[in-house]
């Protein structure tokens, strides 16, 4: 079971949804990096449960504890251990599911592979595991901001069949966090919230799409063939719970264009290190390497699998049973998934930034 990610900037998460705590060990972070603990807490607050009436009612404070690696606001270059204690577990909600495979959950596949079933809150398959990723991602964000002024912004673009079409170049974090669904389009966000509430009343759920924009990306991040930047971003984002699709740049819509329409022409420049393009269908990455343009991505999330409707399924003996979930769950994961997307993008970019310096700093380019 893999719980680690990254080559130089490495994270290992631990803990279960209804265990004593969840957390992360972050190794490979450079020393003397100024880290604001409040910014880490702010990211955790953005993903915590119980923050609004369109999220799960599970009530967790998610207060971060720094156990090692940071002293007086600066990193030591040693492993950074961060912990969040679980305080509102209700494993009894899952007693009736002990030997039942919930539709579209990890129960069945975990049983097939490991011979065990983490029915209580989903165990490691729960989105609660992402607390460690978000905490480590908050450190990665500060590293990227300090050395590159890089800004990562993610927002909800679509909920069910309700979609926003806002000018992404002008989007700010303040706009994104101005409402509980985290869509910077004021009119559309109201419609999204009402749709989620409607489905919640029906005991149902919905999915959607999160869009991510990364500004001030250094050129040269990523490597050819197996360590392409977009490949690592895809793996990172598709490792998040409930993800079902990834696009970068023009994505699937680019297949409708001709080469003459899709190509991003370079602009004449006296400084080749600041090369720019007339368009950005590539999404800021060409040949697996960042070109200095904004990185633009979309990530698809499926409807929450746990719903309040009675469903047919089978138990561990293969017999058909009826089940109805009792646990506390999000009717839509997207509002809380926004900081998770930010975190995974930050972790990939921080890792590639350090890899690039390790490989190329001695080269006279």
Swiss-Prot record:
<dbReference type="Pfam" id="PF01264">
    <property type="entry name" value="Chorismate_synt"/>
</dbReference>
<dbReference type="GO" id="GO:0009073">
    <property type="term" value="P:aromatic amino acid family biosynthetic process"/>
</dbReference>
<feature type="binding site">
    <location>
        <begin position="302"/>
        <end position="306"/>
    </location>
    <ligand>
        <name>FMN</name>
    </ligand>
</feature>
<dbReference type="GO" id="GO:0009423">
    <property type="term" value="P:chorismate biosynthetic process"/>
</dbReference>
<comment type="function">
    <text>This reaction introduces a second double bond into the aromatic ring system.</text>
</comment>
<dbReference type="GO" id="GO:0008652">
    <property type="term" value="P:amino acid biosynthetic process"/>
</dbReference>
<keyword id="KW-0288">FMN</keyword>
<feature type="binding site">
    <location>
        <position position="287"/>
    </location>
    <ligand>
        <name>FMN</name>
    </ligand>
</feature>
<comment type="subunit">
    <text>Homotetramer.</text>
</comment>
<feature type="binding site">
    <location>
        <position position="328"/>
    </location>
    <ligand>
        <name>FMN</name>
    </ligand>
</feature>
<keyword id="KW-0028">Amino-acid biosynthesis</keyword>
<dbReference type="GO" id="GO:0005829">
    <property type="term" value="C:cytosol"/>
</dbReference>
<feature type="binding site">
    <location>
        <begin position="124"/>
        <end position="126"/>
    </location>
    <ligand>
        <name>FMN</name>
    </ligand>
</feature>
<keyword id="KW-0521">NADP</keyword>
<keyword id="KW-0456">Lyase</keyword>
<keyword id="KW-0274">FAD</keyword>
<dbReference type="InterPro" id="IPR020541">
    <property type="entry name" value="Chorismate_synthase_CS"/>
</dbReference>
<protein>
    <recommendedName>
        <fullName>Chorismate synthase</fullName>
        <ecNumber>4.2.3.5</ecNumber>
    </recommendedName>
</protein>
<dbReference type="InterPro" id="IPR000453">
    <property type="entry name" value="Chorismate_synth"/>
</dbReference>
<dbReference type="GO" id="GO:0004107">
    <property type="term" value="F:chorismate synthase activity"/>
</dbReference>
<comment type="pathway">
    <text>Metabolic intermediate biosynthesis; chorismate biosynthesis; chorismate from D-erythrose 4-phosphate and phosphoenolpyruvate: step 7/7.</text>
</comment>
<feature type="binding site">
    <location>
        <position position="47"/>
    </location>
    <ligand>
        <name>NADP(+)</name>
    </ligand>
</feature>
<dbReference type="InterPro" id="IPR035904">
    <property type="entry name" value="Chorismate_synth_AroC_sf"/>
</dbReference>
<comment type="similarity">
    <text>Belongs to the chorismate synthase family.</text>
</comment>
<keyword id="KW-0057">Aromatic amino acid biosynthesis</keyword>
<keyword id="KW-0285">Flavoprotein</keyword>
<dbReference type="GO" id="GO:0010181">
    <property type="term" value="F:FMN binding"/>
</dbReference>
């Amino acid at each position: 079971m893999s719980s680690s990610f990254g080559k130089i900037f490495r994270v290992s998460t631990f803990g279960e949804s209804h265990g004593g705590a969840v957390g992360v060990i972050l190794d490979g972070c450079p020393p003397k990096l100024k880290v604001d603990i409040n910014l880490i807490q702010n990211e955790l607050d953005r993903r915590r449960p119980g923050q609004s009436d369109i999220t799960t009612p599970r009530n967790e404070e998610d207060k971060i504890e720094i156990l090692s690696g940071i002293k007086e606001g600066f990193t030591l270059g040693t492993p950074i251990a961060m912990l969040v204690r679980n305080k509102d577990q209700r494993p009894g909600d899952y007693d009736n599911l002990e030997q039942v495979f919930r539709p579209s959950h990890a129960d069945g596949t975990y049983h097939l592979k490991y011979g065990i079933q983490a029915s209580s809150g989903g165990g490691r398959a729960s989105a609660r595991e992402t607390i460690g990723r978000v905490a480590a991602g908050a450190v990665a964000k500060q590293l990227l901001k300090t050395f590159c002024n890089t800004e990562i912004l993610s927002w909800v673009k679509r909920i069910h069949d309700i979609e926003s079409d806002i000018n992404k170049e002008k989007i700010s974090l303040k706009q994104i966090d101005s409402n509980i669904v985290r869509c910077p389009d004021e009119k559309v966000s109201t419609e999204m919230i009402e749709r989620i509430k409607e489905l919640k009343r029906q005991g149902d759920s919905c999915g959607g799409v999160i869009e991510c924009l990364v500004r001030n990306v250094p050129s040269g991040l990523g490597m050819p063939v197996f360590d392409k930047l977009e490949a690592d971003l895809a793996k990172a984002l598709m490792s998040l719970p409930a993800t079902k699709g990834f696009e970068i740049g023009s994505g699937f819509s680019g297949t409708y264009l001709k080469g003459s329409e899709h190509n991003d022409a370079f602009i004449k420049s006296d400084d080749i290190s600041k090369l720019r393009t007339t368009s950005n269908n590539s999404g800021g990455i060409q040949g697996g390497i960042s070109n200095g343009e904004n990185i633009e991505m979309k990530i698809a999330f499926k409807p929450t699998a746990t719903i309040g409707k009675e469903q047919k399924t089978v138990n561990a003996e293969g017999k058909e049973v009826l089940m109805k979930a009792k646990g506390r769950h999000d009717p839509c994961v997207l509002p809380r998934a926004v900081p998770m997307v930010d975190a995974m993008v930050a972790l990939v970019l921080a890792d590639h930034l350090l890899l690039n310096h390790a490989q190329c700093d001695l080269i006279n380019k």
